[in-house]
């Protein structure tokens, strides 16, 4: 009888210890996930929206529905006759086609 009681106490102690470790792991995972979400939100705030100028920061465009916008540049002739480069964040044609196909597929299949 003493052996069963001792074994039961040992089993309860091990179970409570393992469940406490598991809860600590879950708490740590929640904190890590929250920090990564905060970092992603800060990165989103710093990005350049669609159709805005990205001449000075060509890799800072925001994400679209499926793809990240790309900085697209064109050469513009000013009124004084100088050629300058102007860039804006936009969706490349192949990404537009892919988004169209995906959107069409969602409408058909559900």
UniProtKB/Swiss-Prot annotation:
Residues 1-20 form the signal peptide. The keyword Repeat does not apply. GO terms for molecular function: toxin activity. Residues 21-44 form a propeptide. GO terms for cellular component: extracellular region. Expressed by the venom gland. Its main location: secreted. It holds the Pfam family Toxin_35. InterPro entries: Spider_toxin_CSTX_knottin, Spider_toxin_CSTX_Knottin_CS. It is found in: Secreted. The keyword Magnesium does not apply. Disulfide bonds join 47-62, 54-71, 61-89, 73-87. It comes from the Eukaryota. Keywords: Disulfide bond, Knottin, Secreted, Signal, Toxin. Belongs to the neurotoxin 19 (CSTX) family. 03 subfamily. This is U1-lycotoxin-Ls1jj.
């Amino acid at each position: 009888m003493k052996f069963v009681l001792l074994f039961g106490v040992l089993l309860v102690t091990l179970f409570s210890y393992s469940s406490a470790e598991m809860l600590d792991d879950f708490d740590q995972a929640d904190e890590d996930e929250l920090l990564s979400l905060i970092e992603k939100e800060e990165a989103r705030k710093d990005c350049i929206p669609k159709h805005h100028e990205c001449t000075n920061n060509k890799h800072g465009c925001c994400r679209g529905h499926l793809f990240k916008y790309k900085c697209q540049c064109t050469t513009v002739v000013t009124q004084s006759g100088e050629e300058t480069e102007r860039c804006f964040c936009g969706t490349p044609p192949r990404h537009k086609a892919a988004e169209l196909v995906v959107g069409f597929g969602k409408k058909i299949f559900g």
